[in-house]
Amino acid sequence: MVLVKICGLMHSEDILAVNTAGADFAGFVFAPGRHQISLEQALSLKQLLHPKIKTVGVFVNEPVAEILAIYQAGAIDVAQLHGKSTPAEITQLQQAGLKVIQVFERQAIDLTSMADYLMVDSGKGSGQLLNLKAIPHISRPLILAGGLTPLNVRQAVQLVQPTMVDVSSGVETNGHKDADKITQFIQQAKEDIIYEDIK
């Protein structure tokens, strides 16, 4: 069954929503943007999070030392790396105990990446859906992100068969996380796939 990451969590009610809906991963954005939170906020939110839900820190070209400081403070279990990351940097994070997600645009997936997961994204926070049929089937753990909503995630899972799906703005209403949309998204993503349904 596909795993689900809800990203861009900022408030206690967001945490309550992912706890109730049964997300697998919760994303905290440390990179600049409208979802950015501080280490202190992340630690407070993590205390409210169900212990089975892993936390992912989202970074854009962040120095390894800064990522490790956030990990060592206890805020994250996984580092999601946008921008340029060298194999040495990824290995350094992994040796410290972090799992690593490396983010690529569809045309530029590096199958030799040292990361634990490869994420295919249509662009940071763009809300645009990828051309799903153009995503190559790969044997590496793959995360699908970008433009997913409760209305299209089931078809996306059927077409791409990713390890995980990742959503942020697709479960928001007026710029805030919507508990009903989070529940619907997770239910649709994890629904048993009937391949005859694929058109």
From Swiss-Prot:
Keyword Isomerase: yes
GO biological process: L-tryptophan biosynthetic process
The keyword Amino-acid biosynthesis belongs to this UniProt entry's keyword annotation: yes
Keywords: Amino-acid biosynthesis, Aromatic amino acid biosynthesis, Isomerase, Tryptophan biosynthesis
Membrane-spanning residues: none
E.C. numbers: 5.3.1.24
Catalytic reaction(s) noted: N-(5-phospho-beta-D-ribosyl)anthranilate = 1-(2-carboxyphenylamino)-1-deoxy-D-ribulose 5-phosphate
Xref: InterPro entries: Aldolase_TIM (IPR013785), PRAI_dom (IPR001240), RibuloseP-bd_barrel (IPR011060), TrpF_fam (IPR044643)
Family stated for the protein in its record: Belongs to the TrpF family.
Protein name, UniProt field: N-(5'-phosphoribosyl)anthranilate isomerase
Originating species: Lacticaseibacillus casei (strain BL23) (Lactobacillus casei)
Phylogenetic placement of the source organism: Bacteria, Bacillati, Bacillota, Bacilli, Lactobacillales
